[in-house]
Amino acid sequence: QEGNYWDTFLNLDFNYDKRNQKFQTTDGFRSFYSIDLPIISDNETLKNYYSYSQYFELFDQNISSFSLMLNAAKSISNKDIKLSERINIPTSRLRGFESGRIGPKDGDDYIGGNYGVAINFASTIPQILEQSQNVDFLFFIDAANLWGVDYNKNLDDSGSIRSSLGLALDWYSPIGPLNFSLAYPITKEDSDKEETFRFNLGTTF
């Protein structure tokens, strides 16, 4: 897939946000849909992305969340999409694994997929640092699947669901949101690259 490509896309986003607040959300939901429509493109890749998050209370002094992500990239002219346009599962959606190091492989190369899905559940752990209002401890479970190789069906990885569980700390510090997570893979493949600890600056889970 070497060479020069010309791509012009029209991006449309639809965001319906009913969360009570952006950070440390305690109630509400957010539904987001994005589509990239090829206008002038060498391989005419159509991209669709959807995410949904719901926040609720399971018991007193607890906040839990459920989220879903769906992602798809496919050429509308039945051509093979470029490697740079193939899908990978974000590390925020599948903790415990290195970024871009799961899913279909071509030889030694991880090539991503045409389709991706992720489901996440997180729940705060009460009775820890009760006096601190800017720190959240959470238990989480992640599950994801990445599949579809348009140029070689034999490389498909649709039957391999990856999952993990772990603990996370969200700290809303003066310099911005910080996240620390420890994750343990539950289901995996031998070719996957694991990542037990992850630190993020500027984002929380």
Give, region by region, the residue ranges found by the protein language model.
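C-terminal outer-membrane beta-barrel translocator/porin domains of Gram-negative envelope proteins
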Residues: 1-135, 139-143, 147-149, 191, ...
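Outer-membrane beta-barrel "beta-signal"
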Residues: 11, 169-176, 194-205
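Short amphipathic alpha-helix initiation/capping segments at coil-to-helix junctions
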Residues: 110, 114, 158-162, 171, ...
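Outer-membrane beta-barrel transmembrane domain signature
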Residues: 143-165
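A short, conserved beta-to-alpha structural element at the edge of catalytic cores
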Residues: 162-183
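A short, acidic, flexible beta-alpha connecting loop/helix-capping segment that sits on the rim
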Residues: 183-189
